[in-house]
Amino acid sequence: MKYPRTLIAAAAAAAFVPVPAAASSNPPTSITLVVYDSFPPEGTSLNAALDRFTDETGIDVEVVVAGDAGTMVSKAVLTAGNPEGDVMFGVDNTYLSRVIDEDVFERYEASGLDAIAPELLELVAGGEATPVDFGDVCVNYDIEWFEAEGIVLPTDLASLADPTYRDLLVVENPASSSPGLAFLMASIAEFGDGWVDYWTELVDNGVDVADGWTEAYYDRFSGTGDGDRPLVVSYGSSPPAEVVFAETPIDAATTGVLADTCFRQIEFAGILRGTDSPDEARQLVDFLISAEFQSELALNLFVYPANTGVELPQVFTDFAVVPEDPATLDPEVIATNRAAWIETWTNTVLR
């Protein structure tokens, strides 16, 4: 998931800067972990976990931020077999088939897979990648706004096109945003061949489109900033983030989640084919699904750990939403149609 704005700036400043590991009397072997731009800058407990990995193994981990998930995958495809790193983390199920088809990763069945939720392994049964976390992209709403206006909340994707919610929704462009792409996938999973008609209805109902999540959530959504739109495409785990990062302590979330609008995202890691340090890369992948690393995911990336033995923080239990039946699409179907879907969406919504 994306970071609150105060941390986004720090993360951007840290882009392409190696994260220093703990000092050692002997220079450790160094490997590179390629990540997306939501990975936190140094100084967090997640980075401290990587430092402990260095202490335990003697393997120094340099973190390189390669842009958003789509940009990261595109770079990895272009350098497949001659990678710019050793391990890549942050490939989600909307991009998984592309990574597999382009032979970006070496197959590896990580140590510790018995602790991973079985449903997360279904897409990578042959060791094509390793699931690290999951979450859901969902429509979020401004609780105070709806209470003040006395308007009943929308219940599902179809209701967002109702005139009751005219000019209330902001979404992200799927061509430039991971949650935007996930929301497009949710509409395709829900409406099938009728998804274009659905988006035409949303356009007629005044849907607003931002380039990315940060702009949508902080600039246009009324629940977190100066925006005037009380509905936004974000994450099922956004409400606990609002509690954790509130400038003034609060004991209840100010935003809510429409559980019947969600699309499931699973994030994977893999060993980049052509790495010069395959043994060290395997050790790092093993560590990424260990309880030691997984226990830091919730309050750093605001995602759910893939390791079923990890206990969630209370703020997640209290305020995050895990839908009972989130929308999904077969990664092969996504891979075959992604470009055409985005082009059709662009022609329908932006032109």
Regions found by a protein language model. Name each.
Residues 26-98, 225, 351:
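Early extracytoplasmic/lumenal segment of secretory-pathway proteins
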Residues 1-32:
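Short, low-complexity disordered leader/linker segments with a strong preference
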Residues 93-104, 124-152, 180-191, 266-270:
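Periplasmic solute-binding protein
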Residues 263, 269-329:
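Mature extracytoplasmic/periplasmic domains
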Residues 69-105, 114-125, 219-220, 239-247:
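Pocket-flanking alpha-helical
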Residues 179, 185-260:
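Ligand-binding pocket segment of bilobal, Venus flytrap-like solute-binding proteins
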Residues 106-114, 129-130, 158, 236, ...:
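Short beta-strand->loop
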Residues 83-88, 106-143, 158, 168-174:
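A structural signal for short loop-to-beta-strand junctions that line the ligand-binding cleft
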